[in-house]
């Protein structure tokens, strides 16, 4: 039980450092960019599969 308490403490300290250190804003901006990149890749993949006449695998 002490092991899990220490693990939770370490995770909380790391989250606090990242949250109050300004890295969170940078990571959020990076995540937004990645979201739109992968959204475009999804649309391209769907269009290519539709043009080839292949349906989605079930």
From Swiss-Prot:
Keywords: Cell membrane, Membrane, Transmembrane, Transmembrane helix. The chain crosses the membrane at residues 4-24, 28-48. It comes from the Bacteria. The keyword Isomerase does not apply. The keyword Membrane applies. It is found in: Cell membrane. It is a multi-pass membrane protein. Pfam families: DUF1328. GO terms for cellular component: plasma membrane. InterPro entries: DUF1328. Belongs to the UPF0391 family. NCBIfam families: PRK13682.1-1 (NF010226), PRK13682.1-3 (NF010228), PRK13682.1-4 (NF010229). HAMAP family: UPF0391 (MF_01361). This is UPF0391 membrane protein Maqu_2901. It comes from Marinobacter nauticus (strain ATCC 700491 / DSM 11845 / VT8) (Marinobacter aquaeolei).
């Amino acid at each position: 039980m002490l092991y899990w308490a220490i693990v939770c403490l370490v995770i909380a300290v790391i989250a606090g450092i990242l949250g109050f250190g300004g890295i969170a804003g940078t990571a959020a901006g990076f995540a937004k960019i990645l979201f739109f990149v992968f959204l475009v890749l999804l649309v391209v993949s769907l269009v290519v599969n539709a043009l080839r006449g292949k349906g989605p695998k079930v």
